[in-house]
Every structure is written in structure tokens, then in C-alpha cells.
UniProtKB/Swiss-Prot annotation:
<dbReference type="InterPro" id="IPR018089">
    <property type="entry name" value="OMPdecase_AS"/>
</dbReference>
<dbReference type="InterPro" id="IPR011060">
    <property type="entry name" value="RibuloseP-bd_barrel"/>
</dbReference>
<dbReference type="GO" id="GO:0006207">
    <property type="term" value="P:'de novo' pyrimidine nucleobase biosynthetic process"/>
</dbReference>
<feature type="binding site">
    <location>
        <begin position="59"/>
        <end position="68"/>
    </location>
    <ligand>
        <name>substrate</name>
    </ligand>
</feature>
<comment type="subunit">
    <text>Homodimer.</text>
</comment>
<dbReference type="GO" id="GO:0005829">
    <property type="term" value="C:cytosol"/>
</dbReference>
<feature type="binding site">
    <location>
        <position position="122"/>
    </location>
    <ligand>
        <name>substrate</name>
    </ligand>
</feature>
<feature type="binding site">
    <location>
        <position position="213"/>
    </location>
    <ligand>
        <name>substrate</name>
    </ligand>
</feature>
<dbReference type="InterPro" id="IPR013785">
    <property type="entry name" value="Aldolase_TIM"/>
</dbReference>
<dbReference type="InterPro" id="IPR001754">
    <property type="entry name" value="OMPdeCOase_dom"/>
</dbReference>
<feature type="active site" description="Proton donor">
    <location>
        <position position="61"/>
    </location>
</feature>
<keyword id="KW-0210">Decarboxylase</keyword>
<comment type="similarity">
    <text>Belongs to the OMP decarboxylase family. Type 1 subfamily.</text>
</comment>
<comment type="function">
    <text>Catalyzes the decarboxylation of orotidine 5'-monophosphate (OMP) to uridine 5'-monophosphate (UMP).</text>
</comment>
<feature type="binding site">
    <location>
        <position position="214"/>
    </location>
    <ligand>
        <name>substrate</name>
    </ligand>
</feature>
<feature type="binding site">
    <location>
        <position position="32"/>
    </location>
    <ligand>
        <name>substrate</name>
    </ligand>
</feature>
<protein>
    <recommendedName>
        <fullName>Orotidine 5'-phosphate decarboxylase</fullName>
        <ecNumber>4.1.1.23</ecNumber>
    </recommendedName>
</protein>
Length: 238
């Protein structure tokens, strides 16, 4: 189950990544590379991480016209990443185009990357969604709507908060992948995320993957923090 624990490499550049990964010599991690790091270092950071034996969730949240997204996904698949994402708000045609691009770009003999869609950012509250985005549904209804659209479009799952996982299991079934950021140890600050949960709570609610950043990356001892999160996520009593 440790391979379903994704560590967010929210660093400004490769030097900071190298310093962080020094704590994990011999560990094969599942890491998330987001916009900040990828836009700074480019595909070279993916090559570096792959050479270290790590799995990669390339978190770029594509949202554009279908043809552009298809072409972009073709390029991303050629990097041999393991997971990618789009914004569900881009619509069904865009999401279907994303899958087409991944199939065309995947490396020979390999499966295409897992493709998931962002429903609502974990920094979004229901009040913000209604007042600023103009969606009149409840947050749970909006997330369920996007999740259903995502499944119908042929994607593997969604990014959502842990709070929405039980509802999505009802709507989309148990095989539908749920990737949940906003994971914190009970002693940590929530920072800029609104809908957060502990690793234990994420497990209880049925998340497929959890994404953990600051609780590990900002810890005094990142490896020990990683082990603590892993134990809580896997339900190990120590």
C-alpha cells in the first residue's frame, strides 16, 4: 500500500529535490511533480526521478481545447510517467482527447499512464464555489457530477478530498480511482487547504491514493515522518 502513498515534491528546483531525496536512499517512492518544479526543470526532472526508481504523478491539471490537450498528453505519455491529470471542467470531449493522446504517446510495451480529473481543488470551499465560480450545487453534488462525467469519458478516476470519497464510491463504484490531497498529520497546520484529513481518516473513508506534502517535506526528519504517515495509512499499530 506504500505505493499508493504519493509524496508531493513541492520544491522550486532540482537542488531542493536532491536534498530531500537524500533522506530516502534505497526507498522507491511514488512522487508528485507539480507545476512549479516541472516548469522550472522541464522533462529532465522526470528523467532524473525515473533513473532513481521512483514512480511519478505529473500534476499539471491540463485544461484547454481537446486538440491541444490531446497533443500535450501525447508528449507527457512519452516521458513514461505513471499518472497525469486534467480539470474535469474542461468537459467530456477534452477528457476523451486526453486518453487518446496518452494511448498514442505511451512507450512501446507499456500501459498508458493513469489519467484522473480534478473535480474541485481542496482549497475551494462551498461558499467560494457558489460565489466566485457560479456553481449553485452543493460541493458534494458538484464533485459527484464531475466524477460521473469523468467516468463516462473513460478516465480512471478523480482528484477529490477525502470527504467526497464515500459519495463517489456510490456514484462511480469501488474500482474508480480516488486520489486525495489535503492529507495532514493531526499535529500539522492545514495551511491553504480547506478540506483536509489525516492518513487514518483517508483510509477509513476509502481513498485509493493519498498525496502528502508538507507533513513529510517540511518535517525535521522526513524519513521518520514518511514512516509515520505510511503506518497510519496502512493501519499499522506500533
Amino acid at each position: 500500500m506504500s505505493q499508493s502513498l504519493i509524496v508531493a515534491l513541492d520544491f522550486p528546483g532540482k537542488q531542493e529535490v536532491e536534498q530531500f531525496l537524500h533522506h530516502f536512499e534505497g526507498e522507491e517512492l511514488f512522487v508528485k511533480v507539480g507545476m512549479e518544479l516541472f516548469y522550472k526543470e522541464g522533462p529532465a526532472i522526470i528523467t532524473y526521478l525515473k533513473e532513481k526508481g521512483h514512480k511519478i504523478f505529473l500534476d499539471l491539471k491540463l485544461h484547454d481545447i481537446p486538440n491541444t490537450v490531446k497533443s500535450a498528453m501525447r508528449s507527457l505519455a512519452s516521458l513514461d510517467v505513471d499518472m497525469v491529470n486534467v480539470h474535469a471542467a474542461g468537459g467530456s470531449s477534452m477528457m476523451k482527447a486526453a486518453i487518446e493522446g496518452l494511448e498514442e504517446g505511451k512507450q512501446e510495451g507499456k500501459e498508458r499512464p493513469i489519467c484522473i480529473a480534478v473535480t474541485q481543488l481542496t482549497s475551494t470551499s462551498e461558499t467560494m464555489m457558489k460565489k466566485e465560480i457560479g456553481i449553485e450545487k452543493t460541493l458534494e453534488e458538484a464533485v459527484a457530477h464531475y466524477a460521473k462525467l469523468t467516468k463516462e469519458s473513460g478516465l480512471d478516476g478523480v482528484v477529490c478530498s477525502t470527504l467526497e470519497v464515500p459519495k463517489l464510491r456510490e456514484v462511480c463504484g469501488n474500482e474508480f480511482v480516488t486520489v486525495t490531497p489535503g492529507i495532514r498529520l493531526a499535529s500539522d497546520d492545514v495551511n491553504d487547504q480547506v478540506r483536509v484529513a489525516t492518513p487514518k481518516r483517508a483510509r477509513e473513508l476509502g481513498s485509493s491514493y493519498i498525496v502528502v506534502g508538507r507533513s513529510i517535506t517540511k518535517a525535521e526528519n522526513p524519513l521518520e515522518a514518511y514512516k509515520t504517515v505510511k503506518q497510519q495509512w496502512e493501519g499499522v499499530t506500533v
